[in-house]
Each structure stands twice: as structure tokens, then as C-alpha cells.
């Protein structure tokens, strides 16, 4: 019988630099945070307000909240949720949940009411930790999601509008004089115990609840401490993040930073001048961004005003970054390249990462320790050799436990042999660098040709008059779909639809021309992490052009 899996075509990641440690995610996190607390290290800094949280303060508050949650009545398998924008208190409930074996479901106050009802309806939390901004929505959601018994205000030092703040909740649910040092973390079955319930990207409808275990989380901790695939561990190192904490990318990079003792400098929103000033003032060595912000930095006229000599790394994730934009930004910051990572919410974190000192323009990186990857033919499903495009599949100990109450969708994603089918088109080269080309679902089918939107977006972004662009297929009764684009022009620049179409036609093969037309817009529709919203672009392109 023919072996369907040619082992030569399976790319295997290296052995881990450090072995996976014993204990739950909470046990490991506490051990490292105690170490950094003794060193007097700072855990979080809000660059806008200047507020600092030391590791000692953060650990104490997380232990006290863990005890308060237990006394409130939450036991292993209980559920809590967050509904908040990024704030310095965001990770206190997350860490407390990890300490006591309670599943944590992060959401953002930017969610619409419909999205929030859907998300919290999946995770069914008993307590929601809400920011002041998110409170009205959570109060409304509570009427529908009746498991929610208590709302606690996350980002206030005093009670707010009749709802208890974090300190009040802790005080009410811990004995007088309670010492955080007496609190004991709960050991759990790592493989089975759900640590976090994340929202899938929702690119194919409303998000699903992704169950990530303590095993998934501690594997990520091992990668975070890996000097080749993660960080050089030096406590006190300042890193700047503007990535949403409720998203897998922001959640697991930040938990990884805490394992390494870094000072997480956060901006609650992106402003070019504040961003550059923060990099300079806090001597940040690394910054983590979503691709949307690269276009702004690429065209920035403020860069030369600031001393960014401490910056040694720009990391990108959450959505694909075009090779050209990545290279241009790296040049402007005098860096050898941009550090990329590729992963899905369902793989916990990045499972393909640029190894330290092994940049390759356009590549997403190499397979991380403890993981395997392969590229399969879209028709035969056989694994392919180097430089042949197909669907990327991955296997390893950070694959989710499954979707909440959705075994059918779980089976569609992860096959019987344990391979997760990513739905992304890609290939790897002879040196085992992986290149992600586009989403399988977003490929435009024009007369039997498969046209990747990302390739056309990359071509458009190279034009000096174009600031940003997004591409999608427009339904057509004869051709199937026609490639079309929405374009944001640089300030003060003008182009006609024909000029854009002619420019693209001069750069690509016949099937890839913009036959679906061009629309000029103020901004390209994108999700929170900078992922282009193909469905919204398709709707814009389907509308007839308004006649002047």
C-alpha cells in the first residue's frame, strides 16, 4: 500500500532549547514572577499615564484575586471573562485564572453588542471584568447571558456607577489581613484543563470559542524563553506593545514577556509621535506591531527626530506583512529585517517564527521546537517538496483542545492523524523557511486561475502614490470572480481608476489584472489585528460607482 505521507516532505522543528518545565501554567508563571519581584523589576508601564506596576505588586494582586475568586465560589473548570481595551490591569484576572485552574475568556470593549453576546454566550462566565468603557455593553449582555452573576470594574481604583472595582472585590472576598504569600496555586491536569477560551478570527462568520489548555500555554512559555525562537532572557528589558491583549497574538506574546521578566511598555492607542517618543524615552529594545502600522511607519517623516539606537527588533504578527513593506521599514530603522511569526488562534501562538539572526525577506520563519509542518497538494492531499505551493498543515503540542461545543468544526480543522489544516496557501524553500502566500478561502477564482489577493496588494503598495490597498474577488457570471481593489491614496496624490488598473496590468500576468475595478476609499476595511476584511471589500466593489 502506498504511504500517503512521504516523511522527506515533513519539516520537523528542532529540539527545545529548554525542556518543558513541570507544573501548570499558573505554577510556572508564579515561579518566574517571584524571581523578578525579588529583583525589583517593573512588569507593566502605561506610557501615556506613566503608571508603573512592579512584578511584586502585580504578583500580589493576582494572588489576592485568585484567593478572592476561590472564596467567591469559583472552582477548577469555572469561567471568568474580560471585556476591556488594553490597560495595565488586563492580565491580573488572566494570571489569577491560571493560578486557580479557572478558564479565562478575553474580549474587547470594541466588540459590537452582537459579537459580545455571541462570545460570552460561548464561554458562559460567572464574572466579567470590564473596563469603564465596556460596562454599558456588559450590562446589556448580562440580560441575555444569564450565567453572568457579577461585573467587576477592571480599570478603576474606586467603585464605579454602583459596580465594585477590583480592590473592592478582593477586599470583600478575602479574610482580613490576608497575605498573598500564603496563597497556593492549584495543580491541574495540564493536557485537559482549559486555561483560556479565545475567539477564533471569525473570517468565516461569527467567531468560535477556541479552548487552549495549560499544556498549550506552557509550551508557549518554553518558546518564549528560547534564545533562538523567542527572547534573550534579561529581566528589565523594555518592550513596547500596541497589540490588542484580548487577541491570541497580544495575549501570548505578553505572557511570554512576563516569563522573561521584561518591562511591558504599553500604548493604549497608536499615535505616531507618542509611539516614537516612547521607544526613545524607555529605551525599548523590541516593539511588537500589527501590519497595519507598518504602512504608517514606512512613510513617517518623524523618524529622524528620535534616538532609536536601543531598538534591535521589530516583530510583526496577527496578519500577513508584505515583503516590500517589511523590508522598507527595516531599512528605515536600520535593522537587518522584521521578525515575523505565523500562527492561528487555534495553534495558541506562532508555530513558524523567524529564528534569531536568520532573516529571509518575505519568509514567515521556520518551524518552532516540538512542531512539524507540511505543505499538501490541494487536490491529492499528498505532501509536497520544497518550492511547491499547497495548503500548510501543522502538528504539535500547542494545537487547541477543540472548539467549545463544536466537535464538527474541530474535526474539519484537525484530521484523524492530528494535523491541523490551516487554510493558508504557502510553501517552504530548501533551507526550510516557510512563505505564506494567502488564505485558501480568499483566493480569487478567475476562469480556473487562482489569484492570491496578497500578491496584488503587495504590487499596489509599491506604487509611490498609494498609501494602502486591499483586494478581493467580485462575483461574475462568466469568469467566476474578477480581481478588484480598494485603494487609499497618499495625501495630496491623485490617480484615476484606469491608471491604477494599467499600473497593475504592467506588473502581473493577464489573469491577475484588476478586471473587478478600483474604488478609492478613506481606509481599507480591516480587523483589530490588521487582517484585511475581504468580505467588506467585496461589498464595496459590488456597489455601483456613484455618478457625479
From Swiss-Prot:
CDD domains: Firefly_Luc
Known catalytic reactions: firefly D-luciferin + ATP + O2 = firefly oxyluciferin + hnu + AMP + CO2 + diphosphate
This protein's UniProt keywords: ATP-binding, Luminescence, Magnesium, Metal-binding, Monooxygenase, Nucleotide-binding, Oxidoreductase, Peroxisome, Photoprotein
One Gene Ontology CC term in the entry: peroxisome
Superkingdom of origin organism: Eukaryota
Record carries keyword Metal-binding: yes
E.C. number(s) listed in UniProt: 1.13.12.7
Record has Oxidoreductase as a keyword: yes
Main location: other
Localization per record: Peroxisome
Family recorded in the similarity comment: Belongs to the ATP-dependent AMP-binding enzyme family.
Role description: Produces green light with a wavelength of 544 nm.
Name of the molecule in the record: Luciferin 4-monooxygenase
Species name: Nipponoluciola cruciata (Genji firefly)
